[in-house]
Each structure stands twice: as C-alpha cells, then as structure tokens.
Amino acid sequence: MDIKLFSYWRSSAAFRVRIALNLKNLTHEVIPVDLLKQGGEQHLPSYSAKNPQDLVPVLEHGSHVLRQSLAIIEFLEETYPSPALLPNNALERAWVRALSMDI
C-alpha cells in the first residue's frame, strides 16, 4: 500500500506522524508542504482538496485521505498492529498518550 505523508518540517503534529511511521517501520513518502512560501502551500486548491482545514499533516493511504495527527496515528496502529505503539498496561498507555500530546 502506498503511504504518502504531506508534512511541514517544523510542524509538531506532522512530527508525531513521522515518529509513528518510523516506529512501525512503514515505508512512506514525505511530500513537503511549505507553510510559509507564497502565503502557504497549504492554501493551494490542490492541497485544500485533501484537507479543507488547510493544515498538516495529511496522510494518503492508497485512495484514502486522512487528516489530524492523532486520528492518523490511531489508524496506523489499528491497520498495522505490529509493532505496537501502545503498551498493554493502562497506565503506560496513558503515559504514551500524554507524551504524544506534548510533541
């Protein structure tokens, strides 16, 4: 399955998704979206069609388009359960979730 991540290098939300993709060893292509160039490439019609909120990240998984970093990470965890991003212990899972929100 082709995975494309539309990302900006300084976006903490996109960074979360890059971390998840790499921890899961998923082959993916990073498509840079410059949020500053010419008023922001995220406002171009071609990008707005992927995410009407004009935000990064966006993940294309085959023909499906996903947005919002935590929703993307949950999708990756459910679609590719191994290696797991979340521990089995409830307290440890809470710690990982809190840490992900700090990024």
Language model features with spans:
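GST-like domain detector, emphasizing the conserved glutathione-binding G-site
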Residues: 1-103
